[in-house]
Amino acid sequence: MTGVQTCALPISLIRLTGFNSATDDTLHQAIEKARNEIGRDLAGIIVDMRSNRGGLLDQAESVAEEFIGDGVIFSTQGRHPDSRRTYRSASRKTVTLPMVVLVNGNSASAAEIVAAALQDRGRAVIVGTTSYGKGTVQTVVRLPNEGELVLTWSRLLAPSGYTWNELGVLPNICTAKVADVDKLGLDSVEANRTTLMRWHAERNPTPDEVSNLRKICPPGEDSPDRDIEIASRLLRDPTLYAHAVRTGTVDQASAPRQ
């Protein structure tokens, strides 16, 4: 289910609670509604995917295409040659407004596809806590006895090549580490750069490595109201936003500069 509401103007808050067959269309309509109601004063968009457990893979691809004009969105990789595929955006009409995406420990699967793609491609700042870490694709094999076998077919990979399965997507800004939103500055934003680079460089982390990394921004330490406050603060300060979005990107050329 999807919905839209506006917080303190001129910022639009769009909530995505799942990825069903109508999600992309509903998102597109919500953005157009905000543009029509607010006009040129619209400073940016907050896409709230907290506790979004995912849904249809093709809808995750379509939602990402709303904001990524070309290049890799995500890829899948497994043992079978047919499981290896790269999903690229070929969209000619993309939304270019500044954007913040909210996630938490219950944001999973399709929501993580979108968050990882927008972060890697320098298209959005991710705010909140580390996401759930569901980064695999399953297929159902029907058995002769009318039973079913659920087979893990492939892993999902972000544009940078890391898999968030069990690891999760690490936010650009971890809510738990921001004590005073009014004092959020460039130093605070830049502090997470090295950690994000390490996170995105992981390919096959051990269980201990996963556990230690997830402790950096624990999923259970989210603060819903503070997430919105941080997102609003970023969108009202173009310089701060530009620095924040670049801390998580692997595509430096696509990230905004100030």
Sequence positions of predicted segments:
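Short, small-residue-biased leader/transition segments that mark boundaries at the very start
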Residues: 1-9
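C-terminal "post-core" interaction segments
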Residues: 8-258
